Amino acid sequence: MGIKAYFELIRLNNCLMASFGAFIGGLIASYFNLEMVNNLIFASIVVFLVCGFGNALNDIYDLKIDRINKPERPIPSKRISLTNARIFSYLLVFTGLCISLFNITCFLMAVLNSIVLQQYASTYKKNKIIGNLIVAYLTGSVFIFGGIAVGNIDVTIMLFLCALFAMWSREIIKDYEDIEGDIQEKVISIPIKCGENSIYIAALLLVFAVLLSSLPYLFGFFGIYYLISVVFCDLLFLIGIFPLLINPSRRGAKNASRNIKIVTNLVLVAFVIGSFFK
């Protein structure tokens, strides 16, 4: 029962990425105002802890399934007891909420997201129609959280919307890849309900993300360097999903899902460029 097992329980890399997203979101919103660094550090720690809470909860609720499908995970392998996992998850969220009190709006959002994470783990993992939207919201919300921490959410709302639609699209594509297993597990998902038409739904959501990505330039938040960067990303989005539209397949879905994840990170870089070279 070493610290490595607890890092595995919270999915350390995911927590670090979410924390980094909040920090970058705050940097963008503050236009690299280094006087806000303390607030950004607090926000990043809160996101790390609340994300860890959500990931630990997922393992707690998935114990029966993981005993069969992922017996190497910390709880089914008995490297961490179920009781200790629960205590640890509560400790994470309690600490995160306490730290979030540095900003009352951050505290309220941390409470909201903690409740959403709990509901997702306990109720909506088998209803992916709702669960996909929850995952997309949580992914994008880290940027707004960073913006709240520095007192400016204008730009981060746009980043949130781009991330939400891109991740929502990606989750549907991932479900298309997993459709056979989801049918066996009696999961509700858009691909199960709509079949190949779900690919067109995912593509439409991705088009929304592409259209929204131009808003920071159109509203005057960022300049031409941002526009050039984000148009490049938008082209990669469309190129990445086009083969799946022509020939829907599980392998194509896997490739498209990977491409969307990579390009979403590049969009974040475009926002950084736009903020720095405003």
From Swiss-Prot:
Query: Which residue ranges run through the membrane?
Result: 17-37, 40-60, 91-111, 129-149, 153-173, 204-224, 226-246, 257-277
Q: Which Pfam families match?
A: UbiA
Q: How does it sit in the membrane?
A: Multi-pass membrane protein
Q: Which InterPro entries match?
A: DGGGP_synth, Prenyltransferase_related, UbiA_prenyltransferase, UbiA_sf
Q: What UniProt keywords are attached to this protein's entry?
A: Cell membrane, Lipid biosynthesis, Lipid metabolism, Magnesium, Membrane, Phospholipid biosynthesis, Phospholipid metabolism, Transferase, Transmembrane, Transmembrane helix
- Entry's EC annotation: 2.5.1.42
The pathway that the record names for this protein is:
Membrane lipid metabolism; glycerophospholipid metabolism
UniProt GO BP: glycerophospholipid biosynthetic process
Q: Which GO terms describe its cellular component?
A: plasma membrane
One MF term in GO for this entry?
A: geranylgeranylglycerol-phosphate geranylgeranyltransferase activity
The source's superkingdom equals: Archaea
Q: Which reaction does it catalyse?
A: sn-3-O-(geranylgeranyl)glycerol 1-phosphate + (2E,6E,10E)-geranylgeranyl diphosphate = 2,3-bis-O-(geranylgeranyl)-sn-glycerol 1-phosphate + diphosphate
Task: Tell me where it resides.
Answer: Cell membrane
Q: What are its cofactors?
A: Mg(2+)
Q: What does this protein do?
A: Prenyltransferase that catalyzes the transfer of the geranylgeranyl moiety of geranylgeranyl diphosphate (GGPP) to the C2 hydroxyl of (S)-3-O-geranylgeranylglyceryl phosphate (GGGP). This reaction is the second ether-bond-formation step in the biosynthesis of archaeal membrane lipids.
Family, as annotated: Belongs to the UbiA prenyltransferase family. DGGGP synthase subfamily.
- PANTHER family named among the record's database cross-references: CHLOROPHYLL SYNTHASE (PTHR42723), CHLOROPHYLL SYNTHASE, CHLOROPLASTIC (PTHR42723:SF1)
Protein name, entry field: Digeranylgeranylglyceryl phosphate synthase
Which organism is the protein's source?
Methanococcus maripaludis (strain C5 / ATCC BAA-1333)
